[in-house]
Amino acid sequence: MSLQADFDKAAKDVRKLKTRPDDEELKELYGLYKQSVIGDIDIECPALLDLKGKAKWEAWNLQKGLSKEDAMNAYISKAKELIEKYGI
């Protein structure tokens, strides 16, 4: 299977987890997903009062500089870890 196909499968499988991952795990997945699909963050940091938006922005910004391929590989690894931990 190609890297893109593995990534797409991992993204699909993560949505089927039996238990919701904790916020830190979700933020890491979000950041890796956005880096994989879009690349380096290209939007301004949300307002201070937009806590959810700010958390998402920070998670994506942490992945800045990671190539799309490396981000996909990291996402796949994290997805496998969560699937083992929570089951699907």
From Swiss-Prot:
Give the protein's function.
Binds medium- and long-chain acyl-CoA esters.
UniProt KW Hydrolase keyword: no
Would you identify the family this protein belongs to, as annotated? Belongs to the ACBD7 family.
Residue stretches making up the ACB domain: 3-88
Q: What is this protein called?
A: Acyl-CoA-binding domain-containing protein 7
UniProt entry keywords in alphabetical sequence: Lipid-binding
**Binding residues for an acyl-CoA, per the UniProt record?**
R15, Y30, G31, L32, Y33, K34, K56, Y75
What Pfam families does the record tag this protein with? ACBP
Q: Which domain of life is it from?
A: Eukaryota
An annotated GO BP: fatty acid metabolic process
The GO molecular function terms of this record are: fatty-acyl-CoA binding
Against SUPFAM superfamilies, the record matches this protein to:
Acyl-CoA binding protein
